[in-house]
C-alpha cells in the first residue's frame, strides 16, 4: 500500500488503545502521518517516541480536528508525489485496519469519489447520543442539501489526491469541517460511495473529544443558509403564483388558471434552486422578491 497515505489526527489519546491500533496498522501501511493537535504535556513522551518512527505534524495548541486534517492533507499532497490516495482515520480504535484497507481499495478504483466508511447505527453498541446525532444530521443534510449519507459522523474517509485538493479549502476548523465536506461534495458534484465497516465503540466511546453542545452548534449552523434558501424559495414561488393568478383569472376558468399559476411558479422555483450559487442566495432572493413585488 505504498500508494496510500493514512492520516490520523491525535488529541489526548488513550495511549494503550492507540498503540494497539498502530501496531496493526503499521503492518499494512508504509505511509502514516499523524497530527499532534496540541496534546497535553502528559503525552509528550509518547508523542516524541511516535515522532521517531513516523511523521508527526505538531500543533503547539489545540486547533481542532478540521484544521488538523487540512494541515495533514496539505503536507501529504506536498510530500508524497507517488501516492494516489489519502485515508483519514481516528486514533481511538473505532476503525479496524481491515476497514481502512477496504476504503483505500475502493478509493483506488473510484478516484472521482469520496469514500465513506459507514457504521450500522441499528447496532446496540452505538451510544444513544451518537444514534440521535446521526439521525438528525443525516435528515437535515438530505432535506437541505440533497446529499444521501447514512453515517455523517464517520472519521474514516478515503479520497484521491484530486478530491483532496477540492476539499482542503473547505471551511471549518473543528468537527464541522467533516460535515462541510459532505455539503461540498454535493455542490461540486463529487460522488459519495459508502463502504460498510465494523461498528466499534470502546467503553461507550469515552475517549471522544466531541463537545455535544459547542460542536453540535458549529455543525448545525452550517445549514442556516439552506434554511434561508428554502424560505426565500417559498416566497418566490408564492409571489409568482399570485402574479400569474392575477394575470390569468380573467382569461381562463378557475381550475385552469389555478393549475397554470402553480405550474409557472414551480418552474421558476426550480430554475432558481438549480442555478443560484449558495454564496449569493440571500442577496439574490431578497432583490428578486422586491423586484417581483414592484412589477
Which residues fall in each region the model found?
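Hydrophobic targeting segments
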Residues: 2-8, 24-25, 31-35
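Acidic helix N-cap motif at the loop->helix transition within catalytic regions
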Residues: 16-19, 41-50, 98
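Short, well-formed alpha-helical segments that are part of the catalytic scaffolds
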Residues: 11-27
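Short, high-confidence coil segments that cap the C-terminus of an alpha-helix
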Residues: 81-83, 110-112, 190
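Hydrophobic helical membrane-anchoring modules
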Residues: 1, 8, 15-16, 170-248, ...
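Short beta-strand-to-loop acidic/aromatic patch adjacent to the donor-nucleotide binding site
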Residues: 80-94
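Acceptor/aglycone-binding surface of glycosyltransferases and processive sugar-polymer synthases
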Residues: 61, 67-76, 97-167, 171-175, ...
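A conserved acidic beta->alpha catalytic loop
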Residues: 36-44, 93
Amino acid at each position: 500500500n505504498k500508494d496510500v497515505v493514512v492520516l490520523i489526527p491525535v488529541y489526548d489519546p488513550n495511549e494503550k488503545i492507540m498503540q494497539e491500533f498502530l501496531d496493526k496498522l503499521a503492518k499494512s501501511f508504509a505511509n502514516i502521518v499523524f497530527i499532534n493537535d496540541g496534546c497535553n504535556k502528559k503525552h509528550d513522551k509518547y508523542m516524541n517516541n511516535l515522532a521517531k518512527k513516523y511523521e508527526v505534524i505538531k500543533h503547539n495548541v489545540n486547533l481542532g480536528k478540521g484544521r488538523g486534517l487540512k494541515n495533514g492533507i496539505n503536507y501529504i499532497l506536498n510530500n508524497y508525489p507517488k501516492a494516489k490516495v489519502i485515508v483519514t482515520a481516528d486514533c481511538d480504535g473505532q476503525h479496524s485496519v481491515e476497514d481502512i484497507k477496504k476504503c483505500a481499495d475502493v478509493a483506488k478504483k473510484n478516484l472521482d469519489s469520496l469514500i465513506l466508511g459507514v457504521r450500522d447505527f441499528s447496532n446496540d453498541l452505538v451510544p444513544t447520543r451518537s444514534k440521535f446525532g446521526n439521525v438528525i444530521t443525516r435528515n437535515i443534510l438530505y432535506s437541505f442539501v440533497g446529499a444521501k449519507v447514512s453515517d455523517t459522523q464517520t472519521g474514516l474517509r478515503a479520497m484521491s489526491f484530486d478530491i483532496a485538493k477540492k476539499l482542503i479549502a473547505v471551511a471549518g476548523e473543528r468537527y464541522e469541517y467533516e460535515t462541510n465536506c459532505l455539503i461540498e461534495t454535493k455542490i461540486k458534484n463529487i460522488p459519495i460511495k459508502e463502504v460498510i465497516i465494523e461498528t466499534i465503540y470502546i467503553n461507550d466511546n469515552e475517549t471522544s473529544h466531541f463537545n455535544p453542545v459547542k460542536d453540535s452548534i458549529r455543525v448545525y449552523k452550517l445549514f442556516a443558509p439552506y434554511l434561508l434558501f428554502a424560505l426565500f424559495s417559498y416566497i418566490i414561488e408564492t409571489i409568482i403564483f399570485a402574479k400569474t393568478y392575477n394575470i390569468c383569472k380573467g382569461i381562463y376558468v378557475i381550475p385552469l388558471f389555478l393549475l397554470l399559476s402553480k405550474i409557472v411558479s414551480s418552474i421558476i422555483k426550480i430554475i432558481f434552486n438549480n442555478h443560484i450559487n449558495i454564496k449569493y442566495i440571500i442577496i439574490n432572493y431578497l432583490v428578486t422578491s422586491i423586484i417581483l413585488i414592484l412589477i
